[in-house]
A protein has these predicted regions:
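Carboxylate-rich, polar loop motifs that coordinate divalent cations or form catalytic acidic clusters
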Residues: 1-169
Length: 169
């Protein structure tokens, strides 16, 4: 895959994802490209879809690696939710029905759960920014699995809400 959207480096691993955001989705089949020890390894949409009952895996936005486990990471997507991964294996596929992620179109949550970015703080809490008008734009998942959401760090702009996220390492 030669389409690249964002990259992130954690230790000796470089992650590259191929998604993107637009008013809707680009509907690019998801691909996580990992460079480690001068070797590329891809996790493709076909591999992921086999593990999640053929739910869509499209428009990957970013990757954040667990600071306590170099093979554990999360992938955000613009439309198909948040994926928790261990190597090539999908551990969890989070959507509006099993997390505090919200969907921009409640009738079509599998296509409009827009998780546009994520970070993990020093306590191991995953923070994610959600792109949609039907709920809080900032959600979190604690290490123990507890989900929550907040909106205290938000500014209203032109009828929409813009989250402002600052995480100290």
């Amino acid at each position: 895959n030669n389409t690249m959207y964002e990259m992130a480096c954690f230790g000796n691993k470089l992650y590259v994802v191929n998604g993107g955001a637009w008013a809707s989705q680009y509907k690019r089949p998801g691909c996580i490209m990992i460079l480690q020890d001068n070797k590329w390894h891809n996790v493709t949409d076909e591999q992921v879809k086999k593990q999640i009952a053929d739910d869509p895996f499209l428009d990957c936005m970013n990757v954040v690696q667990d600071p306590q486990d170099a093979n554990h990471y999360f992938v955000t997507t613009y439309g198909t939710g948040l994926f928790e991964m261990q190597g090539d294996k999908v551990l969890n596929h989070f959507m509006s029905d099993n997390s505090t992620l919200t969907t921009a179109a409640p009738l079509y949550p599998k296509n409009y759960t827009r998780c546009v970015g994520a970070q993990i703080d020093s306590k191991g809490t995953l923070w994610a920014v959600v792109g949609g008008e039907n709920g809080p734009p900032l959600v979190y998942k604690k290490r123990d699995g507890e989900w929550g959401s907040i909106c205290q760090f938000c500014d209203v702009y032109d009828g929409g809400i813009l989250p402002v996220v600052y995480l100290k390492s």
